[in-house]
Design a protein with these regions (language model features):
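Pyridoxal 5′-phosphate
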Residues: 1-379
Length: 379
C-alpha cells in the first residue's frame, strides 16, 4: 500500500482545484499589471479570488493580501507590524511554528523587541491567567499565538484571547495556517488584527497563501518594487496560484462538515486501535481530545524500545508516510521544539499522523497493524 498520513505537512492537490488552475497556467498568462486585455483578464481573476475569500472569512477584499505562503505572511506581519506600530513588547509561546518563534527571536536579539513567553500547562495549552498578567504589565503589546498547533494539534480559544487583547489594547496576530480550510473564521466577530493561511494545507497549490490585515491596522509595505497587493507586497502576482487557492478554499468550505465528520472518525479509529493494540502508547499534548485539538492531527509516543529510533524509516518501508514533527524542520537533529518545551529532558520519540479527506479506514487499520508488528505486540 501507499498511504499518506502527513497532511499537516502538505496535502495532495484536489483534481478540481487543478482543473480551475489549468486555464491560467496555459492560456491566461498576462501580467496583471498590464492594461491590455491579457492583463485585465488575469487581474480580474485575482480580484474575484480576493472577493470570494473575503466573503468566506467575512471581511473586506482589501484586507486580504496574497503571499507565497504562511511563513512569508507570518514574517511580514511580525516584522512590518512591529515596525509600523512601534511595538516594543511581544507576547508569544515556546511552541509556535518556527516562522513565528525564529522571527521573534531574531528581532529580540537585534534589540527591536522584548519577547515574553506565556506559560503552558502540561498539555500545551496557554495559561490564560499568565497571559492576562503579561497583557496588564505590557499594555499595547503584540500577541502572537497560533490557532492550531501544527505538531500536537492543540486549539487556541481565539475569542477569549481576542477579548483579552482588546481589553488591554494589544495587537493580536494568529498563525492560522493549520486551521483555515478546516474551521470557519468570522473576522467580523473575531477581535483579531492579523492572521495567515497557506493553500497547500487544504488541498490547494504550494507557493501561495494570504494574510488578513485588519483595515484599521494596516502595515507598511514589506516588499518594495511595485504597487501590487494594495502597495503592501511588491512583485508580479501568482495568478494561477491565487485561482487554485480560491478554488481550494471554496471546496473546503462547501464540504467542511462532511470532511470533518469523515476525518474525525479516522482519528478516533486510530486512537481506539492504538490503545487496544499497543500497551503503553501515549498521546502528546491534547491531540487525543477531539474537542481540544485539530481533528486532522494525532501525535503519538510509543513504548521505549529499539524500534523507536527506526520507526519512521520502518513505516516508510511499509509504504506509510508520517512525520516525527514539523516537516519544516524534519531534517534537524534537535528534535521537536514543541515536545522539548512540553516534556523537557524526556527522551520520548513521537510520530505525528495527520489525516485528510482522501484517507480511508482501511489505511488506518493497515498502519496500526504494522505498528503492532513493529512492537511485537499481538492484536
Amino acid at each position: 500500500m501507499n498511504i499518506y498520513l502527513d497532511n499537516a505537512a502538505t496535502t495532495p492537490l484536489d483534481p478540481e482545484v487543478f482543473e480551475a488552475m489549468k486555464p491560467y497556467m496555459l492560456n491566461h498568462f498576462g501580467n496583471p499589471s498590464s492594461t491590455h486585455s491579457h492583463g485585465r483578464t488575469v487581474k480580474s481573476a485575482i480580484e474575484m479570488g480576493r472577493k470570494k475569500i473575503a466573503e468566506m472569512l467575512n471581511c473586506t477584499p482589501g484586507e486580504i493580501i496574497f503571499t507565497s505562503g504562511g511563513t512569508e505572511a507570518d514574517n511580514a506581519i511580525l516584522v512590518s507590524g512591529i515596525s509600523t506600530f512601534g511595538i516594543r513588547h511581544v507576547i508569544s509561546s515556546a511552541i509556535e511554528h518556527h516562522a513565528v518563534c525564529h522571527t521573534l527571536e531574531v528581532l529580540a536579539q537585534q534589540g527591536k523587541i522584548q519577547l515574553h513567553l506565556v506559560g503552558l500547562d502540561k498539555k500545551g495549552h496557554i495559561d490564560y491567567d499568565h497571559l492576562t498578567h503579561l497583557l496588564k504589565t505590557y499594555s499595547g503589546a503584540m500577541v502572537s499565538l497560533m490557532h492550531a498547533n501544527n505538531e500536537i494539534g492543540n486549539l487556541l480559544d481565539l475569542d477569549r484571547v481576542g477579548n483579552l487583547c482588546e481589553e488591554h489594547n494589544a495587537y493580536f496576530h494568529s498563525d492560522t495556517v493549520q486551521s483555515v480550510g478546516h474551521y470557519p473564521h468570522d473576522l467580523k466577530k473575531l477581535k483579531i488584527q492579523a492572521m495567515t493561511a497557506a493553500a497547500h494545507k487544504f488541498h490547494g497549490p504550494k507557493g501561495i497563501g494570504f494574510m488578513y490585515i485588519n483595515k484599521d491596522k494596516k502595515i507598511r509595505p514589506f516588499v518594495q518594487g511595485g504597487a501590487q497587493e494594495r502597495n503592501i507586497r511588491g512583485g508580479t502576482e501568482n495568478t494561477y496560484g491565487i485561482v487554485g487557492l480560491t478554488a481550494a478554499l471554496e471546496l473546503a468550505y462547501r464540504e467542511m462538515e462532511a470532511h470533518k465528520k469523515h476525518i474525525t472518525a479516522l482519528k478516533a479509529r486510530m486512537i481506539d486501535r492504538l490503545v487496544e493494540s499497543i500497551p503503553g502508547v501515549t498521546f502528546n499534548g491534547d491531540s487525543a481530545d477531539i474537542e481540544k485539538s485539530l481533528y486532522t492531527v494525532l501525535n503519538v509516543s510509543f513504548p521505549q524500545s529499539e524500534e523507536n529510533s527506526m520507526l519512521l524509516f520502518n513505516l516508510d518501508m511499509e509504504g506509510i508516510s508520517a512525520s516525527g514533527g514539523s516537516a519544516c524542520s524534519s531534517g534537524a537533529a534537535t528534535g521537536s521544539h514543541v515536545l522539548n518545551a512540553l516534556y523537557p529532558g524526556s527522551q520520548r520519540g513521537a510520530v505525528r499522523f495527520s489525516f485528510s479527506k482522501f484517507n480511508k479506514p482501511e489505511e488506518i487499520d493497515y498502519t496500526v497493524d504494522k505498528l503492532t508488528a513493529f512492537f511485537k505486540v499481538s492484536v
